[in-house]
Amino acid sequence: MPDDCSILLINGAQKDITKDELKMIKTYMKNGGKMYVFLDARVENLTNLYSLLQSYNVEPQKGVVVESDASKYTQYPIYLLPTIESSDATSAQYNNNVYVLAPSAKGLKDITEKNAKKDSSASDYTVTSLLSTSDGAYSKVDTSSSTLNKEKKDISGPFDISVAVSDSSGGRMIVTGCTNMLLQDIDQAVSGANTDFVLNGVNYLAEQKSKISIRAKSLKTENAVVPAFNQKATLIMTVFVLSLIHIS
C-alpha cells in the first residue's frame, strides 16, 4: 500500500482480493485510511472482500435488487431511484428534489447488531445509510431468471444501496452496490446527479470542510427523471382526457 494513498478505490472487482491484500487493507484502515468500494452485482464469490466489508458491519446480498415501489424506479424495476438519506456525505443533495439512478444494484445490509453479538468491537464501526430502497424491495438471487417476480429464494428488503462507515481510529469507507452509476448515459439521465453523489462521497472521505455540493450545470436542457408510478399516472390521465374529448 503506497504511503501517500489518500483514498483506496476498489471499483467493481471481478476477482477476489488475496489474503495478503486483505491484511494490508485492514492495516491501512486501522491507521485512519479512507476507502471507496463499488460492487458489481453480477459478481459473487468475493470471499475475502466480503469478509472485509462484513468486519465493518456491511453485508453485501446475493443478486440484483428489484424495486416493487413504482415511485422508486424508472422504466424497469431494476433501474432504481433510491432514497437519498440524510448524512454528512449527502447533505448537498438531501431534500433537494434530486434523483440518483442506480441500475442493476447489489443490496447492502447493516449487520452491526449481528456482529455485536459475537464481537464487542463491532460498535467501533458506525454504518450510515446514504441510499436506500423501499421496504418492498427484494434481491433477485437468480439473475438469469426469466421473471422479475419475487420467488421463494429471493431475499426480502429493505436494502441500502450505498453506505458510509466510520471507525474509532478515524478510518472512513463508502460502499456502493452499483458500478453502473457513472456510465455516461446513466449519469446524463439524471443530469449528472450520480457524479455529484460520488464526488460528495469523495469529499466526505477526504474530510474536506468545503462541500462539493451540486456542480454547475450547462445551459442545455436537463433531463426530467420520471418515476414509473408517475409515468403510469400520466398515461392514465392522458387516455382519460383524450377519451372524454372523443366522446364529447
Q: What are these model-predicted stretches?
A:
Residues 1-210:
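Acidic, S/T/G-rich, low-cysteine, solvent-exposed domains in lumenal/extracellular/periplasmic regions
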Residues 240-241:
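C-terminal target-recognition/interaction regions appended to catalytic cores
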Residues 245-247:
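Conserved small/polar residues in nucleotide/adenosyl-binding loops
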